Regions:
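Short acidic/glycine-rich loops and adjacent helix/strand connectors
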Residues: 1-339
Length: 339
């Protein structure tokens, strides 16, 4: 009887680190490092997850046939340098770790840092072959555990290796990308930047989504100038307002944005009507952009089933709009939309 093929998925040097072990395609264990080190959305190498996997389960590193990570690091580095070299000298700020929220901050050399971390963990032990999976491909693969035999898949997050929004067709055991949209034209990135502008921390986007319900449509029309909808499901962030592709989170918005929507709120400051109204505008325009993409997918792909993945899939209000305002008959969002 042949030994089962063991594939170990690893998330490290980015947010929500952890492990997942598959044996002959079936999930055996899944560990989120934050459950052990008690640090929400931890970026630390999953040492405790490895300890539990290899010390308390019937596994060793020698049993692992392939190690996978949810990034194509060459494509990621190429995309990052394309942005940096295209917007110099201001974009040199993107090389500073503080310019990034969800990553370790040094995404350019992600693969090298991962190898160093693995060597520190396992010393001279032979490491299994590494398979790098495109970031949005990894998100889209959630289709395979969905309840659908066929579906359209929409992925939206901060950014992947080459894009921040993408669409796929899934049939049986096949998955094919059909559409994608730029690296820094990102609803996820915009929402994170606005979350910071409103005085909250990264990963508190859900708080801003809730705050939006308390706001008035004061800024909605003006915020539509920030996210410009275009043909074929595309949109772009207006660089007159958004400077995240030059400064990251160090200075994500331009002076024009500040003149239009007000200065940043400091953490702990009083929440005023203008903060609630800005959150409301952000949420409304985010929903409009999501629906713009979904309607393009609906027009160009035959399935009446939709799977949504990536960080923007956590925006439950936008998801409800998809069910209510599009022709998709069934929408499935994974309980865990992380990497």
């Amino acid at each position: 009887m042949a030994r089962p093929v063991n594939i170990l998925g690893l998330v490290s040097k980015t947010h929500d680190t952890g492990l997942a072990l598959l044996c002959d395609g079936q999930p055996k264990v899944i560990f989120e490092e934050e459950r052990f080190n008690r640090e929400k959305h931890t970026k630390k190498f999953p040492h405790r997850s490895f300890e539990i996997l290899f010390n308390h389960a019937e596994n060793s590193l020698a049993d692992i046939d392939y190690l996978t990570i949810p990034w194509d690091t060459k494509l990621l580095a190429a995309s990052f340098f394309r942005v940096v070299t295209g917007n110099m000298p201001a974009s040199l700020h993107l090389l500073r770790p503080a310019a990034h929220a969800t990553q370790d901050g040094r995404i350019v050399n992600l693969w090298m840092r991962l190898q160093i971390a693995m060597r520190r963990r396992f010393r001279s032990m032979k490491l299994p072959p590494l398979v790098q999976v495109g970031h949005h491909d990894a998100h889209a693969a959630i289709f395979f555990v969905s309840p659908f035999e066929d579906a359209s898949v929409m992925v939206m997050d901060g950014h992947g290796d080459v894009c921040a929004s993408s669409a796929y067709e899934g049939h049986g055991n096949q998955l094919r990308q059909t559409w994608q949209l730029g690296f820094f034209d990102s609803l996820g990135m915009l929402y994170t930047c606005a979350t910071q502008h409103l005085g909250f921390k990264p990963f508190e986007e859900g708080t801003v989504m809730a705050l939006a319900a308390c706001g008035e449509p004061t800024y909605v029309d003006r915020f539509r100038d920030v996210v410009i909808l275009e043909d074929d499901g595309r949109f772009r962030l207006n660089r007159d307002y958004v400077s995240v592709d030059r400064y990251g989170l160090l200075r994500p918005f331009t002076q024009k944005f500040l003149d239009t929507f007000g200065p940043p709120r400091l953490p702990g400051d009083e929440l005023k009507d203008r903060h609630r109204d800005l959150a409301h505008a952000l949420q409304v325009v985010t929903e409009e952009a999501v629906l713009h993409i979904v309607r393009h997918i609906e027009r160009t792909q035959p399935s009446k089933n939709l799977v949504i993945s990536g960080g923007v899939a956590l925006n439950c209000v936008a998801n409800a709009r998809i069910l209510r305002d599009t022709g998709f008959e069934r929408v499935w969002v994974p309980p865990c939309a992380s990497d």
